[in-house]
Amino acid sequence: MDIPLICNDSALSQKAKILRKKWGFLSTQSDHFQLHLLPEYLALEQKDDPKQGLVFVDFVSGSVAHRRKFGGGKGQAIAKAIGLKPGVQVDVIDATAGLGRDAFVLASLGCNVTMIERSAVAAALLEDGLERAYLNLEIGTWMKQRMRLHFGSASEYLQHHQTGVVYLDPMFPHKKKSALVKKEMRVFQGVVGEDLDADSLLEAALNAARYRVVVKRPDYAPFLNDKKPTMSIKTKKNRFDVYVKQAMPQNKS
């Protein structure tokens, strides 16, 4: 999908040119999806449905910051699924990074997270969010140490990189009338689409992970690739299917 990047601020015009060249974005207007380079952030808009609002990556404030401060720490479901233990620093590849929220939670809990994203739109939004977060006095230092982004195919990356844990959260068709599907996710999914190769990605993840693979699924979704997990950790909306290969180490992974 060809996505234009619109910039109406002359002070940002050079940056807009750099981003268009780097990511292959267009400079013409669109009747459907388009990116906006604003002084505050890079944002995605569904132009034919403006009520959906702008989608951007924010690791500093809003719901992500609230989750970091009050989300339950290592007692929350995602931490249990990853297998976090006191004194153990886990290397994680988030092979379906999306808007980076789960990756951020894991990094805030001490994991070293490499986010993989093959969508140029998603990767550009993530990079913009990371750059702003790196400058933040409260979280910037550990963000630089623990969160990084790789743009490209997750399957290819996993063929050449081993890690402690691989985390997968592939796009899955939501129930049409589900109130759980947030507006911004509807916009985001409209651009990146479904992960039709998610089943094969599980096998690549199992080959790359030393300790386990964690797959986040809607509570109504079948197991990825119809492969039964070692265990599942359920939440109100989702579940984490955990495929254990071997026990976590008692010290640094």
From Swiss-Prot:
Any one GO molecular-function label of the UniProt entry: rRNA (guanine-N2-)-methyltransferase activity
Keyword Methyltransferase: yes
A single GO cellular-component term on record: cytoplasm
Keywords recorded for this protein, A-Z: Cytoplasm, Methyltransferase, rRNA processing, S-adenosyl-L-methionine, Transferase
Binding site for S-adenosyl-L-methionine: R101, D102, E117, R118, D169
Function: Specifically methylates the guanosine in position 1516 of 16S rRNA.
HAMAP family: 16SrRNA_methyltr_J
Family: Belongs to the methyltransferase superfamily. RsmJ family.
Protein name in the entry: Ribosomal RNA small subunit methyltransferase J
Lineage: Bacteria, Pseudomonadati, Pseudomonadota, Gammaproteobacteria, Alteromonadales
